[in-house]
């Protein structure tokens, strides 16, 4: 099993400029799921995707002329592995001096390599120069929790802050915060994010939810793991009937990661880059 501490994170790296699929460093999802009470071999109470956007994709055409594109990778949450982000960056950089016959050929190669590394089927979408002007931006929709004037003194995940009034009638709400910050599991570097929580169930105390989200501020965990921890904590403490958690993290190393987890059938969220991304 590939362990995070064996990844390229936090280590000097030689930047290869010719294609090398072995640069991808998969990390098993299960150990961190075990930490949040999801044992191996049993179904998890959510499904979803990890949406990666790459802004620094370049290769050479067959005449040696550089090409550029944006890329989106959709990795199902039921794949056994995630990809460590620095290794993903190094892998993408390995195309910089590699001749590729067409964008379609690159897309097929990316699909093959990433599907093999994650152990599932990864969707790949390329946006070439001709379509760059069509890209849109947008913010997460929902009631902004950050409007609340609260006092905060806890900066490690504190699920006991989560409360829901089970005596009240169920509500359907979408709540948003831009105050999510966690830190890389290996390097401790800050990861900044916005998070949207959609639920149906007993009303969740908004001050407690905001304090809980802020409590990740000194926590070291990868993006995908933080979102799954949030999902499980809200489910256990607030017991909603339906729950969806979507986080959009700011870019690092030319990549942003946007995990989505839900326990009900709903379309995957729009992949709209927000102002901080």
UniProtKB/Swiss-Prot annotation:
It comes from the Bacteria. It is found in: Cytoplasm. Its main location: cytoplasm. It is an enzyme of class 1 (oxidoreductase). Belongs to the GTP cyclohydrolase I family. QueF type 2 subfamily. It comes from Cupriavidus pinatubonensis (strain JMP 134 / LMG 1197). NCBIfam families: QueF (TIGR03138). InterPro entries: GTP-CH-I_C/QueF (IPR043133), NADPH_dep_7-cyano-7-deazaG_red (IPR050084), QueF (IPR029500), QueF_N (IPR029139), QueF_type2 (IPR016428). It catalyses: 7-aminomethyl-7-carbaguanine + 2 NADP(+) = 7-cyano-7-deazaguanine + 2 NADPH + 3 H(+). Homodimer. Substrate binds at residues 83-85, 223-224. Its EC number is 1.7.1.13. Catalyzes the NADPH-dependent reduction of 7-cyano-7-deazaguanine (preQ0) to 7-aminomethyl-7-deazaguanine (preQ1). GO terms for molecular function: preQ1 synthase activity. One of its GO terms (cellular component) is cytoplasm. NADPH binds at residues 85-86, 252-253. Pathway: tRNA modification; tRNA-queuosine biosynthesis. The keyword Oxidoreductase applies. Signal peptide: none annotated. GO terms for biological process: queuosine biosynthetic process; tRNA modification. This is NADPH-dependent 7-cyano-7-deazaguanine reductase. The active site is at 184 (thioimide intermediate), 191 (proton donor). Keywords: Cytoplasm, NADP, Oxidoreductase, Queuosine biosynthesis.
């Amino acid at each position: 099993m590939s362990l995070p501490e064996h990844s390229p994170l936090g280590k000097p790296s030689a930047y290869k400029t010719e294609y090398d699929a072995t640069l991808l460093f998969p990390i098993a999802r299960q150990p961190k799921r075990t930490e949040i009470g999801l044992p191996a071999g049993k179904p998890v109470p959510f499904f979803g995707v990890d949406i990666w956007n790459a802004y620094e994709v370049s290769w050479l055409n067959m005449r040696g002329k550089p090409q550029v594109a944006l890329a989106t990778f959709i990795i199902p949450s039921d794949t056994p592995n995630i990809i460590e982000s620095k290794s993903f960056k190094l892998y993408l950089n390995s195309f910089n001096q590699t001749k590729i016959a067409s964008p379609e050929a690159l897309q097929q190669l990316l699909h093959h390599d990433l599907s093999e590394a994650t152990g599932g089927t990864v969707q790949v979408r390329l946006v070439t120069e001709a379509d760059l002007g069509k890209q849109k931006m947008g913010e997460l929709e929902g009631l902004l929790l950050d409007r609340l004037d609260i006092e905060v003194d806890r900066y490690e995940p504190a699920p006991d802050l989560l409360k829901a009034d089970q005596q009240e009638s169920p509500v359907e709400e979408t709540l948003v915060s831009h105050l999510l910050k966690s830190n890389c599991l290996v390097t401790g570097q800050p990861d900044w994010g916005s998070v949207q929580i959609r639920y149906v169930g007993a009303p969740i105390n908004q001050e407690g939810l905001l304090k809980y989200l802020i409590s990740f501020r000194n926590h070291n965990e990868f993006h995908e793991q933080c979102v799954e921890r949030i999902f499980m904590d809200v489910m256990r403490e607030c017991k909603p009937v339906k729950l969806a958690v979507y986080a959009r993290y700011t870019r690092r190393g030319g990549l942003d990661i946007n995990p989505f987890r839900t326990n009900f059938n709903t379309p995957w969220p729009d992949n709209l880059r927000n102002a901080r991304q």
